[in-house]
Amino acid sequence: PLADAKDVDAAMRAAHAAFPAWRALPVAERAALLRKAGDLMQQRVYDIAAALTLEVGKNRMEALGEAQETVDFFHHYADDFEQHAGFDHPLPNDPIDGVVSRNRSVMRPYGAWVVIAPFNFPFALAGGPVAAALVTGNTVVFKSATDTPWSGRLLAEVLRDAGFSKGTFN
């Protein structure tokens, strides 16, 4: 069945309700969950690729490439955020002589993100923004393309099985 306005409202409420606890979780814990999701995707890469082949009509190698790319997104964002301590660091001084900067580069969570996946790369172009949003401390409301709902369901199952808390991914 298709989602209606009530379903969307419920997903947004769940994402907003989960946000305070999720954003408070240390970067290392969010990264560990993201890495676990990537590991689960890796274990399921052939099943995910089979679904992509059936849904989108990709050949086996293209589908495997998309599934593996999504695994790589999850591992990359987890590693990147851990290595850079959540991306909170001072920026260098302005290149103009005598100008001292007091700027910081901070990636911080803002709330619920909406991620809408296209039909032609439904797993990778969902997984990339979802991984970035989650590791940063945002929650996600996801909508798969109408023609490719199976890959979205597989992504949701991976995140559930990895242990993401209720309302973090909707």
PLM region spans:
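Generic recognition of stable, solvent-exposed alpha-helical segments in well-folded globular domains
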Residues: A10, E29-K36, Q43, D47, ...
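Rossmann-like NAD(P) dinucleotide-binding subdomain of oxidoreductase/dehydrogenase enzymes
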Residues: T53, Q83-N170
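Flexible, acidic loop-helix segments that line cofactor/substrate-binding pockets
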Residues: A50-Q68
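Proline-centered turn/helix-capping motifs that create local helix->coil transitions or kinks
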Residues: Q43, H75-P90
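Glycine-/small-residue-rich active-site loops that bind phosphorylated ligands and cofactors
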Residues: L40-M41, N59-E62, F121-P122, D147-T148
